[in-house]
Amino acid sequence: MYRFTLPRDLYHGKDALSSLKTLEGKKAIVVVGGGSMKRNGFLDKAVDYLKEAGMEVKLFEGVEPDPSVDTVMKGAAVMREFEPDWIVAMGGGSPIDAAKAMWAFYEYPEITFEDLITPFSFPKLRQKAKFCAIPSTSGTATEVTAFSVITDYDKGIKYPLADFNITPDVAIVDPSLAETMPKKLTAHTGMDAMTHAIEAYVSTLNCDYTDALALHAIKMIHNDLKKSYDGDMDARDAMHNAQCLAGMAFSNALLGIVHSMAHKTGAAFSGGHIIHGCANAMYLPKVIKYNSKDATAAERYAQIAKFIDLKGETTEELVDALIAELRSMNDQLDIPQAIKNYGPGGVKADVSIIDEKEFMDKLPETAKNAIADACTGSNPRQPSQEEMEKLLKACYYCLLYTSPSPRDISGSR
């Protein structure tokens, strides 16, 4: 038996933000990030709409990128004092993810973060509040998913929290909020969405419902991401819908080891963060090569290649064409092909911010953590410790995974 869960209501299109006026309640807390929603006037609009709905409104501002356990606990404490019956999270994936976790600790102050790490272990929510999510970036799709990614900085590990309980009640997908994204953010979030759709399509939990969403999202992203990156606002609007479709797919089919590796490398090194969407873009071609040793996965990758009009006479040729196309997209979007060329903020660089020796020293533990990640279970192949270490090396040095040893593909950076 499968389950397919979505928000009860999804408002989309220009001026969808005004649907906040339809929410019914007494108090709403609005959770936001670093200030872009305020600078661009969207936060004031949201507050005005909520007040028009008759609600008292409180703000929780300043959620950092890759939100921490500490931020989650602070937000939950504010919620317990204010006692909202609506939690409205707006911005990129970080404030929405943080607000999802705050929601659990608001309703159940006695639980611990460790209680929530096990997938699908959340207590029943909506005892005190409902949840509305409003994305301003076109990538994470957390507005329609059962996921929240929170970082434990003491351990240097990102944890994907997973439970259908944290699927928002209302999603507002207004493309106006995404039109101010800078180019680099457009690239990284777009390839994050592409990874969501591809991993959902080859997941061991895929089904007819998720397949349709994933394939259409892949085609839209393939057609529109570069145009959006170059400033085409119609393509930017299309990408906002495409990432949401990808989110509906992966929230129900789940993900794979591209995300496992991105979660466990993102905050693991002293040189700085590996931005999540950029990590996915770098790792995806290597993981496709690894997963394609499974015949079923290879056939599904080949189906993706055909769907976006790539050429190949055999399944293997189609898989290789898909890998080449994704690497080409990375080049067009100025995304590094490997960690060895990962510069500050995800720019291409001759010298990586991730020290090679530190990476190699931490390789066994990083591989172990990636294998244990919640996303690994639905990957088409279950990697051994040795295989995961080889994959991570491939991601550092720009190699394609082969057996018994990776093959150098470092011709383009």
Indicate where each model-derived feature is located.
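ATP/NTP phosphate-donor binding region
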Residues: 1-86, 339
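Glycine-rich phosphate/pyrophosphate-binding beta-alpha loops
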Residues: 139, 248-257, 263-275
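Carboxylate- and glycine-rich phosphate/diphosphate-binding segment that chelates Mg2+/Mn2+
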Residues: 147-253
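Single conserved hydrophobic/aromatic residue that forms the stacking wall/gate
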Residues: 401-413
